[in-house]
């Protein structure tokens, strides 16, 4: 099961207390103040780790507490600082304050880290309070309390390509063909209840990460069907594969289906509709009137959408689709490079 949300409690370590002590050495019966400071409490730090794919660990353990600083000692000995508690999260984790909703960090790079709760400072020992008017202070500070709060972790899929379409359009079958992913596949809506990641291997060191976004329906932007839970997974994809059912047994007109899904994307976020889309007409093996494909290709080509008709059952035109995915990826990479060059020269 793909867990992409978690709410956890974090409590940094308290600072150690300062010490009240006096120097007691042979031949120095009335030595001065020698109470050491308390150690600092440990921080709680989140760090992005490329080996993790889910937030599953945070489902079973929700409370985290860092070590407190040790108390100061006599002889001006400072207490030992508490150890930081480091929590590893997947790359792409967004960290929010659960109470205010404020975004604390967006961990998008390997090794990127953020302190979510700071340890308390250690209290000063009585040696720090010595003054010309008070040569033997009997006071020391208590350590500060470590920060504590509830935070929310949200993982957005770091996929290059999002596969979208109505339930049963064939998205799970497509990702299983293009990659080694093995999602649950059956002939009823909402078979895929969680996003599935797959990798399309183009060459030894060349691959494209795909995300099978669970079936969307009309009203998804208002939370109907699987709604917001999965619309937000599309946000970080670079482009989309929009699958439509063209079989004789289809439930709706392919163009209507395409436009309904796009309206839901636009309602959720106007930026989503701007993402490039490859339109894939699936189930041509179950289509008797092939002239429909010519009409569809004309319709989508006129609107600037690359179009390919496939059969995921017979694997017809799968190679064409893979080439189209590669071409779209390469074109976007080139545009990104050109844009960065222009910005660099500005």
Curated annotation (Swiss-Prot):
Its EC top class is hydrolase
Here the disulfide bonds are: none
Instruction: Please give a single GO biological process term from the UniProt record.
Output: ribosome biogenesis
Domain (OBG-type G) spans: 159-330
Q: Which GO terms describe its cellular component?
A: cytoplasm
Outline the extent of the Obg domain.
Answer: 1-158
UniProt: GTP binding residues? 165-172, 190-194, 212-215, 282-285, 311-313
* UniProt KW keywords: Cytoplasm, GTP-binding, Hydrolase, Magnesium, Metal-binding, Nucleotide-binding
Q: Where are the transmembrane segments?
A: none
**Record's Pfam families?**
GTP1_OBG, MMR_HSR1
Give its E.C. classification number: 3.6.5.-
Q: Where in the cell is it found?
A: Cytoplasm
Chain residues that bind Mg(2+)? 172, 192
Q: Which InterPro entries match?
A: G_OBG (IPR031167), GTP-bd (IPR006073), GTP-bd_Obg/CgtA (IPR014100), GTP1-OBG_CS (IPR006074), GTP1_OBG_dom (IPR006169), GTP1_OBG_dom_sf (IPR036726), OBG_GTPase (IPR045086), P-loop_NTPase (IPR027417)
Q: Which GO molecular function annotations are given, in alphabetical order? A: GTP binding; GTPase activity; magnesium ion binding
Tell me which cofactor or cofactors this protein depends on: Mg(2+)
**Assembly and interactions?**
Monomer.
Q: Tell me its family.
A: Belongs to the TRAFAC class OBG-HflX-like GTPase superfamily. OBG GTPase family.
The role this protein plays is: An essential GTPase which binds GTP, GDP and possibly (p)ppGpp with moderate affinity, with high nucleotide exchange rates and a fairly low GTP hydrolysis rate. Plays a role in control of the cell cycle, stress response, ribosome biogenesis and in those bacteria that undergo differentiation, in morphogenesis control.
The record's PANTHER family line, in alphabetical order, gives: DEVELOPMENTALLY REGULATED GTP-BINDING PROTEIN-RELATED, MITOCHONDRIAL RIBOSOME-ASSOCIATED GTPASE 2
What protein name does the entry list? Answer: GTPase Obg
Q: Which organism is it from?
A: Sulfurihydrogenibium sp. (strain YO3AOP1)
